[in-house]
Swiss-Prot record:
Gene3D superfamilies: Intergrase catalytic core (1.10.443.10). The active site is at 98, 123. Belongs to the 'phage' integrase family. Pfam families: Phage_integrase (PF00589). The keyword Iron does not apply. Residues 53-187 form the Tyr recombinase domain. The lineage of its organism: Bacteria, Pseudomonadati, Pseudomonadota, Alphaproteobacteria, Hyphomicrobiales. This is Uncharacterized protein y4gA.
């Protein structure tokens, strides 16, 4: 065990080693109550937790570059990909939405008059209403025009009926309601 303990010097390895030493100390103390209790070292756990909590904050220049790339993302087979990518990035950044929340947004969840968006089926199974900046509300213009008008039309995936003839072409790891789905306009 000493050889294994000395092999790696990562923070996660130190935390795992501390957990293992604590388990062995418990076993020894259970077998022989005269063994003094081992004081655990909280530092490895705190270092691992600190390492995983560091978010990456994009600079305004990085965000502008991502949004410009999303607006010019070429796709001859998916007519609405540019608008979808741009709106997804904007909502993720400005409203703090998660991927699953973005995928489940419906046109009925967006209230352009109030400038709010209703997020349903969140990570903790709650519904919340978020205010949106005017710049984000303006970006919904082109996407809401593609909707058939039903409140249950997906916001970030085009409808498959009406004037837009986009047909879902699911990838191997996706399904039609998933962000991994491509839409093909038959030609």
């Amino acid at each position: 065990m000493c050889q294994w303990a000395a092999t790696k010097g990562t923070r996660n390895h130190a935390y795992e080693r501390e957990k293992l030493e604590r388990a062995f100390a418990k076993i020894l103390r259970h077998r022989d109550p005269s063994v003094p209790p081992r004081r655990s070292d909280p530092r490895p756990r705190k270092e691992v937790a600190r390492q995983w909590r560091k978010p990456h904050i994009y600079s305004p220049a990085d965000l502008r570059r991502m949004l410009d790339i999303a607006r010019s993302y070429p796709s001859p087979r998916a007519a609405l990909r540019q608008e979808n990518m741009y709106t997804m990035l904007l909502l993720a950044y400005c409203a703090g939405l998660r991927r699953g929340e973005l995928a489940r947004l419906d046109l009925g969840d967006v209230n352009l008059g109030d400038g709010t968006i209703t997020v349903r089926q969140t990570k903790f199974f709650k519904t919340r209403i978020l205010p949106l900046p005017d710049s984000v509300v303006v970006s919904f213009g082109p996407i809401s025009l593609h909707g058939v008008g039903s409140a249950h039309s997906r916001l970030l995936t085009p409808p498959c009926s009406g004037t837009n003839k986009a047909v879902p072409a699911p990838r191997q790891e996706g399904s039609p309601g998933c962000l991994q789905t491509s839409y093909v306009v038959p030609g």
